[in-house]
Design a protein with these regions (language model features):
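N-terminal Sec-pathway targeting helices
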Residues: 1-16
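Solvent-exposed, non-transmembrane regions of membrane-associated and secreted proteins
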Residues: 20-257
Length: 257
């Protein structure tokens, strides 16, 4: 009987150690991937920074509506035609390509710029948004600890931080554009109690636009003193927020000029 109990204890200990080792490996693998993908994005950003600024892609390049790609995004666009823009915020770690895959809407939730599987994913635009025409571009990014990806948006919960970082740079392939932050708020997704901000892409009329902005201001964590009017172009940045189940942290900004 004692031998039987000893065997059970040994088996249990082996199983426990095996589980601990597996979990440890998974954690190590995750953070190793975070570091690897972070470095890869830094290399992509360096390509953009070092790119020439006075050339454009030839007229026969496959660009929407025949427009020319900005010189600094040429090489990246030719590597992956799912790229639709670039987002950055001065003084923050957010400095990434932005993708869109209309036929596979959430593809970049779990894929990197090279279309390889990645837990970090790549910031991407909601599939029903038209980069050139929509009133509101909804852009998603993972909330990764350490201020990586859209995890850096967590800092916008503080008004004092907002005061030092009031604008967002979001370039399309053909236009460099600055956006002014209108509101920062928290809500929950997939719930009747939450605000379905992701449903607003194109305003049906002025009332529809004002209703969206009004709800954003109502939920805002603080008053930015900035609002938006019918005809303004918006971007809405969305990432996970962990104070509630299916929580979301949302930053809404309007195009300047």
């Amino acid at each position: 009987m004692k031998n039987y109990k000893s065997i059970i204890c040994v088996v249990a200990a082996v199983c426990l150690l095996g589980t601990a080792a597996f979990c440890g490996f998974r954690i190590y693998h995750y953070y190793a991937e975070v570091d690897e993908q972070t470095e890869a994005f830094e290399e992509i950003a360096e390509m953009v920074e070092q790119a020439p600024t006075d050339e454009t892609v030839p007229d026969d390049a496959p660009v929407s509506e025949g427009e020319d790609v900005l010189a600094k995004y040429q090489e990246l666009y030719l590597q992956n035609e799912d790229m639709v823009g670039w987002i950055s915020i001065a003084g923050m770690t957010i400095n990434y390509p932005v993708m869109q895959s209309r036929n596979n809407p959430n593809f970049y939730l779990k894929h990197n710029f090279e279309k390889e599987y990645s837990d970090l994913g790549t910031p991407y635009v909601q599939e029903n948004c038209d980069i050139a025409e929509s009133d509101n571009l909804v852009i998603y990014g993972h909330h990764i600890k350490g201020g990586k990806m859209f995890g850096a948006l967590e800092d916008y919960k503080s008004k004092s931080f907002y005061e030092e970082h009031k604008t967002i740079q979001f370039d399309t392939l053909t236009e460099q554009t600055e956006y002014e932050i209108v509101a920062v708020f928290k809500t929950v997704a997939y719930s009747s109690e939450g605000f379905r901000y992701y449903d607003f892409v194109d305003a049906e009329n002025e009332e529809d636009f004002n209703s969206y902005i009004g709800k954003c201001k109502e939920l805002a964590l603080y008053d930015t003193g900035v609002t938006a009017g019918y005809g303004d172009r918006l971007i809405t940045l969305s990432t996970c927020e962990y104070s509630a189940q299916n929580g979301r942290l949302v930053v809404v900004a309007k195009k300047v000029g």
